[in-house]
Design a protein with these regions (language model features):
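Bacterial N-terminal signal peptides
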Residues: 8-20
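N-terminal non-cleavable signal-anchor helices
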Residues: 4, 12-14, 45
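Scaffold/interface architecture of coatomer-like assemblies
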Residues: 24-314
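Short, aromatic- and cysteine-enriched interfacial helices/patches
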Residues: 3, 23-24
């Protein structure tokens, strides 16, 4: 699941009568109410064959912040409601790939449940909200299919706007929800006003899992020699952003590849564990805190979550 980066909470109220260690897909709700800082993590656990590991309990997780063991105060193994942001590159460089990108995005919409919400943003010379975060999946689907390719590419502007918009939707006292962002693009930024560092800083604050899908075509491959330096830089940026936030980075060559990619992301989001802890370090200094999760009593189980977070400032 995805919760928040750092959320202010004094009381975690579980509104589900069943225990928090139930199987995936179990309905569960939680409410946050203001006070001290809770650090919330989405954790995916896989075996050596990259299959998701289910059936874990809070006792199987050891959470460290800057090397110091933390007390886990919240744990859920249930599939919680999802807030999903789809960021769609519709610049001119996507002309030969826009239909593929649209099909992949609509696939995400079809996989969502009534309890989930979807935000759609496209990027050309600037970023704009095509469909606000809501349960209206039909409107989101229509917005996606109505896009066309033109203009330059402001990927970092789009990521920044999306992270800001998702953060704005977090309200004190609301039910606990997962949050994730999926970027479909050819990966080359050309006109953003904000920098990659700006996006990374905001991502570390927001705690939203970011998944990047880099689309390619035969034209892209033939241009690789000329664009090698730029392509390598943008590819590294997308991979680093996904890794830092606990998401994943994918490369898709054909529409059939994309179908498997979005199914893989959906399965992963449904298989996440939600973990929350009150950090022993209560300083509000804006410093970066490194987070490490280890699995106890499960040989070869490999956890993946965000690498850390930025502490709030006073």
């Amino acid at each position: 699941m995805h919760v928040t980066g750092t959320m202010k909470t004094l009381v975690l109220v579980l509104l589900c009568a069943a225990g928090t260690t139930g199987a995936f897909g179990q309905d569960q709700a939680a409410t946050f109410k203001g006070g001290v800082d809770l650090v919330a993590l989405n954790v995916v656990v896989v075996d050596p064959q990259q299959q998701f590991v289910g059936g874990l309990t809070a006792g199987n997780f050891a959470v460290y912040e800057d090397g110091v063991l933390q007390d886990v105060s919240f744990f859920a193994a249930a599939e919680l409601p999802l807030d999903l942001a789809i960021l769609l590159d519709t610049s001119a460089s996507m002309y030969d790939k826009i239909a593929t990108a649209q099909k992949a995005a609509v696939g995400f919409v079809s996989a969502l449940r009534p309890v989930d919400r979807l935000l759609v943003i496209d990027i050309k010379d600037s970023a704009r909200v095509l469909s606000p975060l809501s349960h209206d999946l039909d409107a989101a689907r229509s917005a996606i299919l109505g896009t066309s390719a033109a203009g330059s590419t402001a990927i970092y502007n789009g990521l920044y706007l999306t992270l800001k918009e998702m953060a704005r939707q977090k309200q004190p006292g609301q039910n606990l929800r997962r949050q994730a962002l999926v970027l479909l693009s050819d990966g080359d930024d050309t006109t953003s006003l904000v920098s990659y560092d700006d996006v990374m800083e905001l991502a570390r604050q927001a705690g939203i899992s970011i998944y990047t899908i880099k689309l390619r075509s035969s034209q892209f491959e033939s241009d690789m020699a000329r664009r090698n330096a730029q392509a390598s830089k943008s590819e590294y940026a997308m991979k680093e952003l996904a890794q830092e936030t606990g998401g994943r980075s994918f490369h898709a060559l054909q529409v059939n590849d994309l179908s498997g990619v979005y199914k893989s992301i959906g399965h992963e989001l449904a298989s996440q564990y939600a973990i929350g802890y009150m950090p022993t370090n209560q300083r509000r200094d804006g410093a970066y805190r490194r987070v490490n999760v280890r699995i106890v009593d499960r040989a070869n189980a490999q956890p993946r979550t965000r690498a850390g977070y930025l502490a709030p400032r006073k």
